[in-house]
């Protein structure tokens, strides 16, 4: 369980099929069940759409599910761009480097900055996996994943190429697709079974949201519905949730990491 200190309470996040420890041993006020396959009875529940790629399939079947244009760009990057794939074994050692890179990307696109507290807590629990596509000594794209059981979920994706010339933008676009592909290969070799694309937007009314969804669909994942469930674990947590609901009626919440990404 990932423990997160809030303003007045301690949250505990459990992902996918994870179960929290018994309340007497959890040490948290509120339990957040993330990406559950089924809703938790009597919980505050919201739905979240996502896409998932089956990593138990052979590599040729996985890449064969990519849309043709995506598959072409991955193969071109493999053959001509001189990219290097790096997976950071101890994510905590490179957390600031990743977050600084992401924040530069986020400022270009007017997105929320990286949630360093969340990232650091995930790293402490050994569930954070960082990866990077390099060309020479220059990082082109960074990804951050959350690992839970046999599933790995994309949490952040960042590439900084806005304002650059078109050839460089095309290179970074290929590198991003290539990095996703090599991330999947890495996780498959590590014995994971499912690559979750970190959510898709139900509302595609803006070009930005439609573009992110379209990018993820290029990889041919299967559409799934997740449930985000919130359960108080202490009287303090129950009171705080009631106050939080009143506050959110006036101020929209900060988005969960699932959708803090860009294509």
Residue ranges of predicted features:
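Intrinsically disordered, low-complexity, positively biased terminal segments
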Residues: 1-39, 154, 158-160, 171-178, ...
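Short glycine/proline-enriched coil/turn segments at helix->beta-strand junctions
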Residues: 25-28, 125-128, 189-191
């Amino acid at each position: 369980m990932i423990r997160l200190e809030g303003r007045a309470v301690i949250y505990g996040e459990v992902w996918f099929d994870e179960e929290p420890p018994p309340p007497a041993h959890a040490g948290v006020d509120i339990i957040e069940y993330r990406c559950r396959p089924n809703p938790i009875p009597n919980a505050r529940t919201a739905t979240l759409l996502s896409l998932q790629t089956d990593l138990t399939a052979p590599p040729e079947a996985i890449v064969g599910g990519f849309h043709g244009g995506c598959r072409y760009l991955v193969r071109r990057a493999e053959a001509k761009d001189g990219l290097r794939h790096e997976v950071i074994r101890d994510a905590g050692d490179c957390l600031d480097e990743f977050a600084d890179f992401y924040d530069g990307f986020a400022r270009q696109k007017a997105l929320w900055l990286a949630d360093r507290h969340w990232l650091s807590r995930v790293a402490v629990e050994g569930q954070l996996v960082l990866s990077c596509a390099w060309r020479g000594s220059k990082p082109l794209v960074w990804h951050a994943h959350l690992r839970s059981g046999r599933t790995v979920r994309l949490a952040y994706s960042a590439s900084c190429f806005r304002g650059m010339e078109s050839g460089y933008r095309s290179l970074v676009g290929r590198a991003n697709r290539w990095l996703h592909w090599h991330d999947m290969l890495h996780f498959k070799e590590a014995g994971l079974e499912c690559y979750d694309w970190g959510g898709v937007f139900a509302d595609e009314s803006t070009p930005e949201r439609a573009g992110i969804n379209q990018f993820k669909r290029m990889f041919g994942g299967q559409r799934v519905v997740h449930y985000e469930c919130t359960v108080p674990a202490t009287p303090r947590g129950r009171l705080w949730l009631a106050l939080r609901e009143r506050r959110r009626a006036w101020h929209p919440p900060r988005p969960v990491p699932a959708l803090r990404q860009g294509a």
